[in-house]
Amino acid sequence: MITRLIHPICVAVMLIIASACEKYEPDWDIFEAYGVAEEIKTDFYERYSEDVKVTSAVTSYNKSQVEFVDTDGLKCTAVYKGHTWMMTQKEFNKNGFAFLKQLPERIAKAYLRAGVSKEFYEWDQSYVIEVTRRGFDKKAYEFQFVVFDENEFPKLAYREYFVLIDEDGELLDIRSRHNRSIWWYDMSGCVDFVRQKYPEATILAGINDSSDNVLYIKDKGVLKTVRFDYRGSDEQTWSATIYRLEDYDKLPDTVLDEYAKYRVYHPDFNYSEVYRVETKDGIYYGLKSATTSLTVYFKA
Protein backbone atom coordinates (compact mmCIF):
# COMPACT_ATOMS: atom_id res chain seq x y z
CA MET A 1 0.00 0.00 0.00
CA ILE A 2 2.82 2.37 0.89
CA THR A 3 4.58 1.62 -2.40
CA ARG A 4 1.42 2.44 -4.32
CA LEU A 5 1.14 5.85 -2.63
CA ILE A 6 4.73 6.95 -3.29
CA HIS A 7 4.34 7.31 -7.06
CA PRO A 8 1.23 9.57 -6.99
CA ILE A 9 2.81 11.71 -4.27
CA CYS A 10 6.03 12.18 -6.30
CA VAL A 11 4.05 13.15 -9.37
CA ALA A 12 2.03 15.68 -7.38
CA VAL A 13 5.18 17.21 -5.89
CA MET A 14 6.82 17.54 -9.33
CA LEU A 15 3.72 19.25 -10.72
CA ILE A 16 3.70 21.69 -7.82
CA ILE A 17 7.41 22.49 -8.34
CA ALA A 18 6.95 22.95 -12.09
CA SER A 19 3.96 25.20 -11.51
CA ALA A 20 5.89 27.26 -8.98
CA CYS A 21 8.88 27.67 -11.30
CA GLU A 22 6.62 28.82 -14.09
CA LYS A 23 4.79 31.19 -11.80
CA TYR A 24 7.89 32.82 -10.31
CA GLU A 25 10.06 32.95 -13.44
CA PRO A 26 11.14 36.61 -13.76
CA ASP A 27 9.75 38.67 -16.62
CA TRP A 28 13.14 39.56 -18.15
CA ASP A 29 13.15 42.94 -19.90
CA ILE A 30 16.57 43.59 -21.43
CA PHE A 31 15.74 47.27 -22.07
CA GLU A 32 14.77 47.93 -18.48
CA ALA A 33 17.63 45.83 -17.09
CA TYR A 34 20.25 48.00 -18.78
CA GLY A 35 18.56 51.35 -18.33
CA VAL A 36 17.42 51.90 -21.91
CA ALA A 37 14.56 54.41 -22.05
CA GLU A 38 10.98 53.22 -22.49
CA GLU A 39 10.62 55.59 -25.47
CA ILE A 40 13.41 53.72 -27.26
CA LYS A 41 11.87 50.35 -26.47
CA THR A 42 8.49 51.50 -27.81
CA ASP A 43 9.98 52.91 -31.01
CA PHE A 44 12.11 49.82 -31.53
CA TYR A 45 9.21 47.37 -31.38
CA GLU A 46 7.02 49.61 -33.54
CA ARG A 47 9.84 49.66 -36.08
CA TYR A 48 10.77 45.96 -35.98
CA SER A 49 7.84 44.17 -34.26
CA GLU A 50 8.13 41.73 -31.39
CA ASP A 51 9.18 38.90 -33.68
CA VAL A 52 12.86 39.90 -33.53
CA LYS A 53 15.16 38.59 -30.81
CA VAL A 54 16.90 41.35 -28.84
CA THR A 55 20.33 40.20 -27.63
CA SER A 56 21.68 43.45 -26.15
CA ALA A 57 20.43 46.92 -25.27
CA VAL A 58 22.83 49.47 -23.83
CA THR A 59 22.79 53.22 -23.19
CA SER A 60 26.02 55.19 -22.81
CA TYR A 61 25.81 58.95 -22.37
CA ASN A 62 23.39 60.09 -25.10
CA LYS A 63 23.74 57.03 -27.35
CA SER A 64 21.76 53.80 -27.16
CA GLN A 65 22.54 50.67 -29.13
CA VAL A 66 20.16 47.74 -29.56
CA GLU A 67 21.50 44.51 -31.01
CA PHE A 68 19.01 41.97 -32.31
CA VAL A 69 18.46 39.08 -34.69
CA ASP A 70 15.83 39.79 -37.34
CA THR A 71 13.24 37.40 -38.73
CA ASP A 72 15.73 36.24 -41.39
CA GLY A 73 18.20 35.22 -38.69
CA LEU A 74 20.62 38.06 -39.49
CA LYS A 75 22.41 40.11 -36.84
CA CYS A 76 21.33 43.77 -36.73
CA THR A 77 22.17 46.85 -34.68
CA ALA A 78 19.91 49.88 -34.20
CA VAL A 79 21.44 53.13 -32.93
CA TYR A 80 19.59 55.93 -31.13
CA LYS A 81 20.73 59.43 -30.25
CA GLY A 82 18.77 60.51 -27.22
CA HIS A 83 15.37 58.96 -27.92
CA THR A 84 15.66 59.40 -31.70
CA TRP A 85 16.44 56.51 -34.05
CA MET A 86 19.46 57.33 -36.25
CA MET A 87 20.40 54.19 -38.17
CA THR A 88 20.22 50.42 -38.39
CA GLN A 89 22.90 48.09 -39.69
CA LYS A 90 22.17 44.55 -40.91
CA GLU A 91 25.07 42.11 -41.30
CA PHE A 92 25.20 39.42 -43.96
CA ASN A 93 27.25 36.24 -43.81
CA LYS A 94 30.58 36.98 -45.50
CA ASN A 95 32.00 33.45 -45.23
CA GLY A 96 32.09 31.57 -48.50
CA PHE A 97 30.29 34.47 -50.23
CA ALA A 98 27.06 33.34 -48.56
CA PHE A 99 25.85 36.95 -48.74
CA LEU A 100 25.22 36.58 -52.48
CA LYS A 101 22.24 34.36 -51.63
CA GLN A 102 21.11 36.51 -48.69
CA LEU A 103 21.15 39.88 -50.47
CA PRO A 104 18.27 41.10 -52.66
CA GLU A 105 18.89 39.74 -56.17
CA ARG A 106 19.47 43.17 -57.76
CA ILE A 107 22.12 43.99 -55.14
CA ALA A 108 23.94 40.69 -55.63
CA LYS A 109 23.94 41.20 -59.41
CA ALA A 110 25.22 44.77 -59.04
CA TYR A 111 28.07 43.53 -56.85
CA LEU A 112 29.04 40.89 -59.41
CA ARG A 113 29.00 43.55 -62.15
CA ALA A 114 31.27 45.87 -60.14
CA GLY A 115 34.34 44.28 -61.69
CA VAL A 116 36.22 43.32 -58.53
CA SER A 117 37.92 39.95 -58.32
CA LYS A 118 39.91 37.79 -55.92
CA GLU A 119 38.14 39.34 -52.94
CA PHE A 120 39.21 38.02 -49.54
CA TYR A 121 36.48 38.18 -46.90
CA GLU A 122 38.19 36.06 -44.25
CA TRP A 123 39.98 39.21 -43.07
CA ASP A 124 38.73 40.27 -39.61
CA GLN A 125 37.84 43.79 -40.73
CA SER A 126 35.84 42.73 -43.77
CA TYR A 127 32.03 42.85 -43.80
CA VAL A 128 28.88 43.02 -45.90
CA ILE A 129 26.12 45.20 -44.46
CA GLU A 130 22.87 46.94 -45.26
CA VAL A 131 22.61 50.46 -43.81
CA THR A 132 19.38 52.35 -43.21
CA ARG A 133 19.78 55.96 -42.02
CA ARG A 134 17.44 58.59 -40.64
CA GLY A 135 16.58 61.17 -43.31
CA PHE A 136 17.92 59.10 -46.22
CA ASP A 137 15.62 58.08 -49.05
CA LYS A 138 17.29 54.75 -49.79
CA LYS A 139 19.08 51.91 -48.08
CA ALA A 140 22.73 51.31 -48.95
CA TYR A 141 24.84 48.18 -49.17
CA GLU A 142 28.50 48.23 -48.14
CA PHE A 143 31.16 45.63 -48.99
CA GLN A 144 34.55 45.81 -47.26
CA PHE A 145 37.29 43.33 -48.22
CA VAL A 146 40.93 42.99 -49.24
CA VAL A 147 42.66 41.80 -52.40
CA PHE A 148 46.12 40.31 -52.11
CA ASP A 149 48.68 41.77 -54.50
CA GLU A 150 50.21 38.80 -56.32
CA ASN A 151 52.93 41.00 -57.81
CA GLU A 152 54.24 42.08 -54.42
CA PHE A 153 56.58 40.29 -52.06
CA PRO A 154 55.87 39.14 -49.47
CA LYS A 155 52.50 37.67 -50.43
CA LEU A 156 50.94 39.27 -47.36
CA ALA A 157 50.84 42.59 -49.23
CA TYR A 158 47.23 43.52 -49.91
CA ARG A 159 44.94 46.41 -50.76
CA GLU A 160 41.70 47.28 -49.02
CA TYR A 161 38.60 47.85 -51.11
CA PHE A 162 35.15 49.21 -50.40
CA VAL A 163 32.15 48.85 -52.72
CA LEU A 164 28.99 50.93 -52.23
CA ILE A 165 25.69 50.06 -53.92
CA ASP A 166 22.33 51.76 -53.45
CA GLU A 167 18.96 50.12 -52.84
CA ASP A 168 18.08 50.11 -56.54
CA GLY A 169 21.27 48.26 -57.47
CA GLU A 170 23.27 51.23 -58.77
CA LEU A 171 27.02 51.13 -58.14
CA LEU A 172 27.85 54.37 -56.31
CA ASP A 173 31.54 53.99 -55.59
CA ILE A 174 34.58 51.73 -55.42
CA ARG A 175 37.26 53.09 -53.14
CA SER A 176 39.72 52.27 -50.39
CA ARG A 177 38.65 51.55 -46.84
CA HIS A 178 36.54 54.09 -44.95
CA ASN A 179 35.35 54.42 -41.36
CA ARG A 180 32.64 52.02 -40.24
CA SER A 181 29.21 53.56 -40.73
CA ILE A 182 28.04 52.59 -37.25
CA TRP A 183 30.74 54.84 -35.76
CA TRP A 184 29.30 57.84 -37.65
CA TYR A 185 25.63 57.23 -37.08
CA ASP A 186 24.45 60.86 -36.99
CA MET A 187 24.48 62.58 -40.39
CA SER A 188 21.39 64.71 -39.75
CA GLY A 189 23.23 68.02 -40.21
CA CYS A 190 24.53 66.94 -43.60
CA VAL A 191 21.06 65.73 -44.59
CA ASP A 192 19.56 69.12 -43.67
CA PHE A 193 22.18 70.89 -45.81
CA VAL A 194 21.47 68.69 -48.84
CA ARG A 195 17.71 69.19 -48.48
CA GLN A 196 18.21 72.96 -48.62
CA LYS A 197 20.85 73.11 -51.37
CA TYR A 198 19.40 70.34 -53.55
CA PRO A 199 15.66 70.25 -52.72
CA GLU A 200 14.83 67.85 -55.57
CA ALA A 201 17.61 65.39 -54.77
CA THR A 202 17.24 61.82 -53.56
CA ILE A 203 19.71 60.93 -50.81
CA LEU A 204 21.07 57.48 -51.60
CA ALA A 205 23.89 56.73 -49.15
CA GLY A 206 26.40 58.22 -46.73
CA ILE A 207 29.86 57.18 -45.56
CA ASN A 208 32.62 58.70 -43.45
CA ASP A 209 36.04 59.24 -45.01
CA SER A 210 38.77 60.14 -42.49
CA SER A 211 36.20 61.94 -40.26
CA ASP A 212 34.62 63.76 -43.22
CA ASN A 213 31.07 62.77 -44.15
CA VAL A 214 30.34 61.98 -47.80
CA LEU A 215 26.76 61.81 -49.10
CA TYR A 216 25.75 60.31 -52.44
CA ILE A 217 22.71 61.90 -54.02
CA LYS A 218 20.78 61.75 -57.28
CA ASP A 219 19.93 65.32 -58.32
CA LYS A 220 17.79 65.75 -61.43
CA GLY A 221 19.03 62.41 -62.71
CA VAL A 222 22.71 63.14 -62.03
CA LEU A 223 24.71 61.17 -59.46
CA LYS A 224 26.60 63.61 -57.23
CA THR A 225 29.00 63.25 -54.31
CA VAL A 226 28.58 65.86 -51.57
CA ARG A 227 31.59 66.15 -49.27
CA PHE A 228 31.82 67.75 -45.83
CA ASP A 229 34.74 68.75 -43.58
CA TYR A 230 34.71 67.60 -39.97
CA ARG A 231 34.95 70.51 -37.53
CA GLY A 232 34.66 68.59 -34.25
CA SER A 233 31.70 68.00 -31.92
CA ASP A 234 29.73 66.34 -34.74
CA GLU A 235 29.90 69.53 -36.83
CA GLN A 236 30.37 68.98 -40.55
CA THR A 237 30.76 71.85 -43.03
CA TRP A 238 30.11 71.52 -46.75
CA SER A 239 33.33 71.52 -48.77
CA ALA A 240 32.47 70.35 -52.29
CA THR A 241 29.95 68.73 -54.61
CA ILE A 242 31.46 66.58 -57.34
CA TYR A 243 29.89 64.93 -60.35
CA ARG A 244 30.98 63.60 -63.71
CA LEU A 245 30.00 65.44 -66.86
CA GLU A 246 28.75 63.79 -70.01
CA ASP A 247 31.06 63.58 -73.01
CA TYR A 248 28.96 66.11 -74.89
CA ASP A 249 29.14 68.76 -72.14
CA LYS A 250 31.22 71.73 -73.28
CA LEU A 251 34.02 73.06 -71.10
CA PRO A 252 34.16 76.80 -70.34
CA ASP A 253 36.59 78.76 -72.53
CA THR A 254 38.69 79.68 -69.49
CA VAL A 255 39.23 76.00 -68.70
CA LEU A 256 40.07 75.18 -72.32
CA ASP A 257 42.65 77.99 -72.33
CA GLU A 258 44.27 76.72 -69.13
CA TYR A 259 44.26 73.18 -70.47
CA ALA A 260 46.04 74.32 -73.64
CA LYS A 261 48.73 76.00 -71.52
CA TYR A 262 49.11 72.85 -69.43
CA ARG A 263 49.57 70.72 -72.53
CA VAL A 264 52.56 72.83 -73.58
CA TYR A 265 54.54 71.41 -70.65
CA HIS A 266 52.71 68.06 -70.52
CA PRO A 267 52.18 67.10 -74.17
CA ASP A 268 51.40 63.47 -73.32
CA PHE A 269 48.46 64.34 -71.09
CA ASN A 270 45.06 63.47 -72.51
CA TYR A 271 41.86 63.24 -70.50
CA SER A 272 39.03 60.75 -70.75
CA GLU A 273 36.68 61.97 -68.00
CA VAL A 274 35.63 65.43 -66.80
CA TYR A 275 34.32 66.24 -63.32
CA ARG A 276 32.65 69.43 -62.17
CA VAL A 277 33.57 70.46 -58.64
CA GLU A 278 31.43 73.05 -56.85
CA THR A 279 33.09 74.71 -53.83
CA LYS A 280 32.74 77.86 -51.74
CA ASP A 281 35.64 79.30 -53.71
CA GLY A 282 34.06 78.72 -57.09
CA ILE A 283 33.72 76.08 -59.78
CA TYR A 284 36.56 73.79 -60.79
CA TYR A 285 36.83 71.22 -63.55
CA GLY A 286 38.81 68.04 -63.04
CA LEU A 287 40.28 66.41 -66.13
CA LYS A 288 41.14 62.77 -65.47
CA SER A 289 44.02 61.25 -67.40
CA ALA A 290 43.14 58.60 -69.96
CA THR A 291 46.16 56.49 -68.99
CA THR A 292 46.87 57.13 -65.28
CA SER A 293 45.00 58.00 -62.07
CA LEU A 294 46.09 61.66 -62.35
CA THR A 295 43.36 64.32 -62.35
CA VAL A 296 44.25 67.94 -63.14
CA TYR A 297 41.96 70.73 -61.89
CA PHE A 298 41.31 74.08 -63.53
CA LYS A 299 39.20 76.90 -62.10
CA ALA A 300 36.38 78.16 -64.29
Which residue ranges define each predicted feature?
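Bacterial Sec-dependent N-terminal signal peptides
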Residues: 2-5, 12-42, 48-51
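Compositionally biased, intrinsically disordered low-complexity segments
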Residues: 5, 9-20, 110, 132-134, ...
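First exposed extracellular module after export/assembly in secreted or surface-exposed proteins
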Residues: 31-300
